[in-house]
UniProtKB/Swiss-Prot annotation:
The gene is ispD. PROSITE patterns: ISPD. Its EC number is 2.7.7.60. GO terms for molecular function: 2-C-methyl-D-erythritol 4-phosphate cytidylyltransferase activity. It is an enzyme of class 2 (transferase). The record marks R158, K210 as: Positions MEP for the nucleophilic attack. It comes from Dechloromonas aromatica (strain RCB). Pathway: Isoprenoid biosynthesis; isopentenyl diphosphate biosynthesis via DXP pathway; isopentenyl diphosphate from 1-deoxy-D-xylulose 5-phosphate: step 2/6. The record marks R16, K23 as: Transition state stabilizer. This is 2-C-methyl-D-erythritol 4-phosphate cytidylyltransferase. Belongs to the IspD/TarI cytidylyltransferase family. IspD subfamily. Keywords: Isoprene biosynthesis, Nucleotidyltransferase, Transferase. One of its GO terms (biological process) is isopentenyl diphosphate biosynthetic process, methylerythritol 4-phosphate pathway. Catalyzes the formation of 4-diphosphocytidyl-2-C-methyl-D-erythritol from CTP and 2-C-methyl-D-erythritol 4-phosphate (MEP). It catalyses: 2-C-methyl-D-erythritol 4-phosphate + CTP + H(+) = 4-CDP-2-C-methyl-D-erythritol + diphosphate.
């Protein structure tokens, strides 16, 4: 029976956030932001191991106590210049235990509000899927395309548009092959699409937000507090 593993690329600097440290280490309810991200994954009985892909020179990780997350957690200092490179390196680190037909969930370090229900939905809907898929939510807002002067150039129809989230879940062998061929993608689904396959969209939730700006951190704190 296929097993489930998770990879969390955490080598980014979070420059858009404008903080003194990478955003994955910013305080969120008394813990580093990434602690909450990893806690959601390590708490799942369906996930056997979680690899955190760090930058080779990351000075922040050793400053915190991660022991509460248990023995599933493993760090590898092989983060690359891009997300695709970091995930590919994480897949290589998993090669000693992962088989081609095992599932790999790739999850953003800066999505700390992933819930058990979201993971369960992903596992249930993709269990027998031939391709794999991603958590996503239908686009609710009206979309405007800007022109060169930052004026509205067009209003884009939102019918059928979804906003991609993570985790993104694909077979170990397939994902590795796709990323080897497609290095200029912004997410794993993009690599799968580039080799001619169609990932399934599994409805997520707006609370599964990605912390990108300071206001997002406050919102994530509200979401996590409400769950306690």
């Amino acid at each position: 029976m296929p097993r489930h593993y998770a990879i969390v690329p955490a080598a980014g600097s979070g420059s858009r956030f404008g903080a003194e440290k990478p955003k994955q280490y910013l305080d969120l309810l008394g813990r580093p932001l990434i602690f909450h991200t990893l806690a959601a994954l390590t708490a799942s009985p369906d996930i056997e191991r979680v690899w955190v892909v760090l930058a080779p020179d990351d000075p922040w990780w050793p400053r915190y106590d991660w022991s509460e997350l248990g023995s599933k957690l493993e760090t590898v200092r092989c983060g690359g210049a891009t997300r695709a490179e970091s995930v590919s390196n994480g897949l290589r680190a998993a090669a000693m235990v992962a088989a081609d037909d095992d599932w790999v969930l790739v999850h953003d370090a800066a999505r700390p509000c992933l819930s058990a229900a979201m993971l369960d939905a992903l596992f249930a809907e993709l269990a027998s899927d031939p391709v794999g898929g991603i958590l996503a939510v239908p686009v609710a807002d009206t979309l405007k395309r800007a022109d060169a002067e930052q004026r509205v150039g067009a209003t884009e129809p939102r019918d059928g548009l979804w906003q991609a989230q993570t985790p993104q879940m694909f077979r170990y062998g397939l994902l590795g092959e796709a990323l080897e061929k497609c290095r200029d993608v912004t997410d794993e689904a993009g690599a799968i699409e580039a080799v001619g396959l169609k990932p399934k969209l599994v409805r997520g939730d707006s609370t599964n937000l990605k912390v990108t700006y300071p206001a997002d951190l406050a919102l994530a704190a509200m979401i996590l507090r409400a769950r306690k």
